Swiss-Prot record:
Record lineage: Bacteria, Pseudomonadati, Pseudomonadota, Betaproteobacteria, Burkholderiales
Role: Acts as a chaperone.
Region annotation (Disordered) ranges: 613-634
SUPFAM superfamilies associated with the record: Actin-like ATPase domain (SSF53067), Heat shock protein 70kD (HSP70), C-terminal subdomain (SSF100934), Heat shock protein 70kD (HSP70), peptide-binding domain (SSF100920)
Segments crossing the lipid bilayer: none
Family: Belongs to the heat shock protein 70 family.
InterPro entries, sorted: ATPase_NBD (IPR043129), Chaperone_DnaK (IPR012725), Heat_shock_70_CS (IPR018181), HSP70_C_sf (IPR029048), HSP70_peptide-bd_sf (IPR029047), Hsp_70_fam (IPR013126)
Keywords of this entry: ATP-binding, Chaperone, Nucleotide-binding, Phosphoprotein, Stress response
CDD domains per record: ASKHA_NBD_HSP70_DnaK-like
Residue numbers of Phosphothreonine PTMs: 200
Induction comment: By stress conditions e.g. heat shock.
GO MF annotation: an example: ATP binding
Protein name listed in UniProt: Chaperone protein DnaK
Length: 650
């Protein structure tokens, strides 16, 4: 059985890890980095770039470079968070036929799971290159506060990438696993994981207990905001720069997508620099131009200014901490360790706020970028049966229920219930002789169903005529270990049953996922062809260079006819390399043609080199002979006449 890899599919960066024995290995990607930007670029020639190469070209291709797609995964187009992003993103966010938020690149509609699958495929390939064997199974992390649709969409992304998702695990829980197994402290401890990533915020209160030599990780509560993260901090800096530039130059950069992409890069860089220095300078020459000529942007930002810009964002993370502590039934003073996860927690202001709330210094011995992937890899090892000393008890982050008479949300499973879990309840009809009931499933904490997230709905038909309140309909909610909900309804009188996995009114159908898998496979074949074409071009370029060099050195030793033949073959190879529409076969044919034409040139070079070597060997032999003679002479010269006297024996 192959290894189960752990993948942290992040909003800004992603990371992959595996377990080797009891040691964890965070794997470097093909660029040599341990984290990969979650950025995907769709190029004009159908090539798909993922990670650092996609990020590098984002300034020149803003409309087709997709980033922070995790913020859209499993979301409806109408949601206010999505509507907010539409005005900020350089790429187009569109409404899919099923009402979900999708994006558009090169006129093609793409589902967020399909785009995230490109990042997962890169992570899969990174692991395969390191292990030297195929990888088919993974544990993928999601924010703890992700709802059912978002978890299902993440699982779909894994499927499209060719991975069997063995488990969806919450990011703070994964970080706690990484932290707990790395520390030697014994005894029960309560820890708070404060996870502020690129696009999402989570806080979990977790109890780590030692039960008969087994490490038990029990999540007591979780809370968060799935639309708050480093991207929002970047946006505050971007808005500030746009405002200052408009005041100074009278030009509004928010309408210029190329300028926006440069601003985004500069804002991220400035934010990172201000974590270690008090002031930074943003310098972007030729940011735009008007009738008076080009405009340059030069702006100093201090740490104090940045903190003022994002103060309310940092403050927004504290209320979920308060709720999580209350829901866990503990006091702030009961928390033994505070762990910071996510790149945004490197900001001194964030660390200061966390220290102020929890009353203690956060731990600094956890890598905020890698802890989540490490935890996912540990869970992968547990699921594969290679590790028996770890037990993980996670919770469902939001209450689940159904809409009952008057539009009320009747909760079936309350938030922070340990999963997997199952709950059944009997309901009845609202009208006399009602032959069918529609069951609408919601997720959220509001009293009225309309204020919560509608996950799906289904009908139970064929109920025998009876007065209202008489039929008995048993509704069962079953949450699996991934936090994904399965619902069933049964008429107790007739035994009629209807079951669904909640993904009815949104998300991708199996047919759509299968089509995306096929497209991905076709893309892989296309990518392979592009790679082969690039290899042929490189081979052709190298041959042109070496042939020209050889002609310069040895061309005068060839017959005029032979030289002309080589020059003609060289010219036709150069022409085919200049032709961007030329395929691999055309290039290979010209390479072979030049190779054959250059045979005589090769023979001349070889003969010349042999002659040089023979000459060098002869010279060396002569020198060696001279050295021998000189040595003999020296040996003779080194003879010393010794004085001796004869000793007579008695």
């Amino acid at each position: 059985m192959g290894k189960i890899i752990g993948i942290d599919l992040g909003t800004t960066n992603s990371c992959v890890a595996i377990m080797e024995g009891n040691q964890v290995k965070v794997i470097e990607n093909s660029e040599g980095a341990r984290t990969t930007p979650s950025i995907i670029a769709y190029m004009d020639d159908n090539e798909v770039l993922v990670g650092a190469p996609a990020k590098r070209q984002s300034v020149t291709n803003p409309k087709n470079t997709l980033f922070a797609v995790k913020r859209l995964i499993g979301r409806r187009f109408e949601e206010k968070e999505v509507q907010k992003d539409i005005g900020l993103m350089p790429y187009a966010i569109i409404k899919a036929d099923n009402g979900d938020a999708w994006v558009e690149a090169h006129g093609e509609k793409l589902a967020p799971p399909q785009i995230s699958a490109e990042v997962l495929r890169k992570m899969k390939k990174t692991a395969e290159d390191y292990l030297g064997e195929p990888v088919t199974e993974a544990v993928i992390t999601v924010p703890a506060y992700f709802n059912d649709s978002q978890r299902q969409a993440t699982k779909d992304a894994g499927r499209i990438a060719g991975l069997e998702v063995k488990r969806i695990i919450n990011e703070p829980t994964a970080a706690a696993l990484a932290f707990g197994l790395d520390k030697a402290e014994k005894g029960d401890r309560k820890i708070a994981v404060y996870d502020l990533g690129g696009g999402t915020f989570d806080v979990s209160i977790i109890e780590i207990a030692d039960v008969d030599g087994e490490m038990q990780f029990e999540v007591l509560s979780t809370n968060g905001d799935t639309f708050l993260g480093g991207e929002d901090f970047d946006q505050r800096i971007i808005d500030y720069i746009i405002g200052e530039f408009k005041k100074e130059q009278g030009v509004d950069l928010s309408k210029d997508v190329l300028a926006l992409q440069r601003l985004k890069e500069a804002a991220e860089k400035a934010k990172i620099e201000l974590s270690s220095s008090q002031q930074t300078e943003i310098n972007l020459p030729y940011i735009t131009a008007d009738a008076s000529g080009p405009k340059h942007l030069n702006l100093k930002i201090t740490r104090a200014k940045l903190e003022a810009l994002v103060e309310d964002l940092v403050e927004r993370t504290i209320e979920p901490c308060r709720i999580a502590i209350k829901d866990a039934g503990v006091k702030v003073s009961d928390i033994d360790d505070v762990i910071l996860v996510g790149g945004q927690t490197r900001m001194p202001k964030v660390q200061e706020k966390v220290k102020e709330f929890f009353g203690k210094e956060p731990r600094r011995d956890v890598n905020p970028d890698e802890a989540v992937a490490v935890g996912a890899a540990i869970q992968g090892q547990v699921l594969s049966g290679d590790r028996k000393d770890v037990l993980l008890l996670d919770v469902t982050p939001l209450s689940l229920g159904i809409e009952t008479l008057g539009g009320v949300m009747t909760k079936m499973i309350t938030k922070n219930t340990t999963i997997p879990t199952k709950h059944s309840q009997v309901y009845s009809t609202a009208d006399d002789n009602q032959s069918a009931v529609t069951i609408k499933v919601f997720q959220g904490e509001r009293e009225m169903a309309a204020g919560n997230k509608l996950l799906g709905e289904f009908n139970l038909e064929g109920i025998p005529p009876a007065p209202r309140g008489v039929p008995q309909i048993e509704v069962t909610f079953d949450i699996d270990a991934n936090g994904i909900l399965h619902v069933g309804a049964k008429d107790k009188a007739t035994g009629k049953e209807n079951k669904i996995t909640i993904k009815a009114n949104s998300g991708l159908s199996d047919a759509e996922i299968d089509q995306m898998i096929k497209d991905a496979e076709a893309n892989a074949a296309e990518d392979h062809k592009l790679r082969e074409l690039a290899d042929s071009r490189n081979q052709g370029d190298a041959l042109v260079h070496s042939t020209k060099k050889a002609l310069t050195e040895y061309g005068d030793k060839l017959d005029a006819g032979e030289k002309e033949k080589i020059e003609a073959a060289l010219k036709s190879l150069e022409d085919v390399l200049k032709d961007t529409s030329a395929d691999k076969a055309a290039i290979d044919a010209k390479v072979e043609e030049l190779g054959k034409a250059s045979q005589k040139l090769g023979e001349k070079m070889y003969a010349d080199m042999q002659a040089q070597q023979a000459g060098a060997a002869g010279a060396a032999g002569a020198a060696e002979g001279a050295a021998h003679a000189g040595g003999a002479q020296q040996a003779a010269d080194d003879v010393v006449d010794a004085e001796f006297k004869e000793v007579k024996k008695d």
